[in-house]
Amino acid sequence: MTKKSVQNDYLHTILGYLSRYRMLALPGLAVMALIALGQLAGPYILKQIIDVAVPKEDTGLLLAYAFAFLGIVSVTGLLSYVGMMLLARLGLSIVTLIKQDLFSHLLKLPISFFDKHPVGELMSRTETDTERVRDMFSNLGANLIVNVLTMIGIFGVTFALVPRLALIMAGVSVLLLTVLIVFFSKIFSMYEKARSFYAAIVAKVTEFIQGIEVLKAYGRTGWAETELDAAAKQRVSLEVRISLIEYTMMSVLESLIGPLFIVALLLLYAPKVLTGTMTLGMVLLFVEYGARLLRPIAEIAESLRSLQQARTSLSRIRKLMAIAEEPNRGVGKAPSLDREIRFDHVWFAYEGDEWVLRDLSFVIPKGSFAAIVGASGSGKSTIISLLCGFAHPQKGHILIDGVPLDEIDIVAWRKHIGLVLQESFLFPVSVLENTRLYHEEISEAKVREAISVVHVDGAIEALPEGLATNLWERGANLSSGERQLVSFARALAANPKLILLDEATSNVDMTTEKRIKESMDVLRKGRTMIVVAHRLSSVLSADRIFFLSGGRLIAQGTHES
């Protein structure tokens, strides 16, 4: 993609969001134009006071100009407030929309995407980067619009009075802006690198907090601190370099070029006052306009710096939004499970890896209890992922009543699945909402029935507020066995057609395992159930047992056979 096309895409994205909130953007733009007009009118009124009211010694005219000046300053201040409020609301509205679009897109990405991207990196995209974009649409946008309109107004008024001076001002402004634009384009890569350093730090902090138990248990908190400190120092070093370059440029502009420009104006036009070819008010107007011209140039330069950062953030967001969503070719095709689940010569491998499943074929009739047994790495859990549509076979087909799974609406299909993993995730919300996952159609009575069936009702009722008790992070105020039983209750409350248990009993004690086996007897009634297990002893009651080794089906049958 060429630099021009990237720029066009960038502008297209900005205009796309602005068009959706034009009822805020257009009034905001109009107010910014009035503010720029007010900033031009103030110095002109002072010129009239010096050139007209004072020579005439007309007190009434002097007071009229003074009140006009006061009125313009007051109205400009009020308009600044209104304009900032409009653009702040615009920025909030747009960033909310971006966050909604981004989060909605994240939810539609395949599971494999989340395996490759740290949580901290995604948090940086959804929060930090979006807030920078918000700043672009509110504060930066307001400053840039006012400054650009002010510059245009200064050129216009000056050209009407002294065309030669207007051309000089325009030439100096174009030269300075060109230098600044080239300067900021050269250090754009430094901004991108600084943002990547920040994202890496957020990712490290997130990972270290998630793995705090392991770090403490192995005495590696010191190493984690050193790692984070090194990453922070790397970022600080780069940020200091960027700031040094920026401040050097801005200091040259404000402390050297600005005063030289004002002195040049005075040397050029002050003598004309002595010869009577120009009024004192006119000279002071040009000096004031000259000073006001340099200020917008400096502020535009500062805005360009922040806009570059916002552009980097928007670029990251757009890259994330461009990632292909999870395929769902069967949208609208309602799934069913009236006869069987069939694996027909299925081959599967993870990206760039060896085959995990090799020419796998088997049939699981509706309403049966099937067990998949094998050593670690034999492909058992991969079968669960394929059935959930989290991954897709490279060769062969998974058929639901003869229909390929990739031709069924995968979102609708998942609603018929009750999934219990080896380590099921519990949210930091109430036990009630953890069990029904905010499905309002699942009543509290249904939830109570489910937790009773899986024999975790006693533990839940012992909590301070029973079902209404908020769980700690990852359900830490429950034992591991209780957490797993809540996951079983979640599967039961959803009343699915298909139950998938992936090593659901491998991390629990004997008492909890006994409860789980009793729960499985209830869960399987009227449903199809597939259980992945290491130990054959945990699935003795299965209707059909499939033995995997190296991704191949090496045997199948009942326990008796």
Question: Across the structure, where does each feature detected by a protein language model lie?
Answer:
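Cytosolic ends of transmembrane helices, especially the final helix of ABC transmembrane type-1 domains
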Residues: 197, 220, 244, 293-320
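Hydrophobic transmembrane alpha-helices
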Residues: 71-75, 205, 283-303, 307
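Membrane-integrated ABC transporters
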Residues: 1-39, 54, 58-66, 83-87, ...
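A hydrophobic transmembrane-helix motif
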Residues: 41-43, 47, 141-184, 240-284
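ABC-type nucleotide-binding domain
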Residues: 336-561
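Hydrophobic alpha-helical membrane-associated segments
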Residues: 34-38, 42, 70, 75-87, ...
